[in-house]
Amino acid sequence: MGHKINPTGLRLGITQEHRSRWYAPARTYPTLLQEDERIRKFVNKKYASAGISSVLIARKADQLEVELKTARPGVLVGRQGSGIEELRAGIQKTLGDKSRQVRINVVEVERVDADAFLLAEYIAQQLEKRVAFRRVIRMAVQRAQRAGVLGLKIQVGGRLNGAEIARTEWTREGRVPLHTLRADIDYATKVASTTYGVLGIKVWVFKGEVLPGQKQQPPVGAAPRRRASRRPQEFEDRSNEE
């Protein structure tokens, strides 16, 4: 019987990059890996309203670099960069080391509706507001199509609309070639907590095919957003540099 592998893990080093970029000896590897997990849990819990798509962590000597890809960078940066200082202090407290050098970069997601995690988060928020799941899926598909994705698959499982028996419903628009390694597949999962229990959400987004060493370009037919004239924002923290 066939089993579905995680599309992100299958394509690491081909079209996907590692979420943690560092090397460590065997004796310290478990400790650093647990630190990464604590950092991600802290960021996703404290800044749940910031629309954080991914948290990338890199380590260089004694410096820790955290890159946050978000749909709303203003929520993280704050007024005059006050949010960056608060975030750094929170990470240092989470790690139990206030002297740890932490460098934070905030990057704005260019196409919010083409990001699998942000789409899954949108679906979860609507389901928690008791919106009918078929309507939510239809709206999510329309948003993704306006963003110019080449293919999209959405799966929702659980007690849909409060049904007594749990079931799984899914829909697919366009191409989603999961067997093609050069296919740029963005995959995300999310859990929606409702009065009838939890609903599991899975989203696959096909953005095109890319060869190793090439950078994925947005499709030609991608519909621009209302704020398309703005350049993607990137806020780089250099406060720890001398």
UniProtKB/Swiss-Prot annotation:
Belongs to the universal ribosomal protein uS3 family. Residues 214-242 are annotated as: Disordered. Keywords: Ribonucleoprotein, Ribosomal protein, RNA-binding, rRNA-binding. PANTHER family: 30S/40S RIBOSOMAL PROTEIN S3, SMALL RIBOSOMAL SUBUNIT PROTEIN US3C. InterPro entries: KH_dom (IPR004087), KH_dom-like_a/b (IPR015946), KH_dom_type_2 (IPR004044), KH_sf_prok-type (IPR009019), Ribosomal_S3_C_sf (IPR036419), Ribosomal_uS3_bac-typ (IPR005704), Ribosomal_uS3_C (IPR001351), Ribosomal_uS3_CS (IPR018280). This is Small ribosomal subunit protein uS3. One of its GO terms (biological process) is translation. One of its GO terms (molecular function) is mRNA binding. Residues 39-110 form the KH type-2 domain. Transmembrane segments: none annotated. One of its GO terms (cellular component) is cytosolic small ribosomal subunit. Pfam families: KH_2 (PF07650), Ribosomal_S3_C (PF00189). Binds the lower part of the 30S subunit head. Binds mRNA in the 70S ribosome, positioning it for translation. Part of the 30S ribosomal subunit. Forms a tight complex with proteins S10 and S14. Residues 231-242 have a biased composition (Basic and acidic residues).
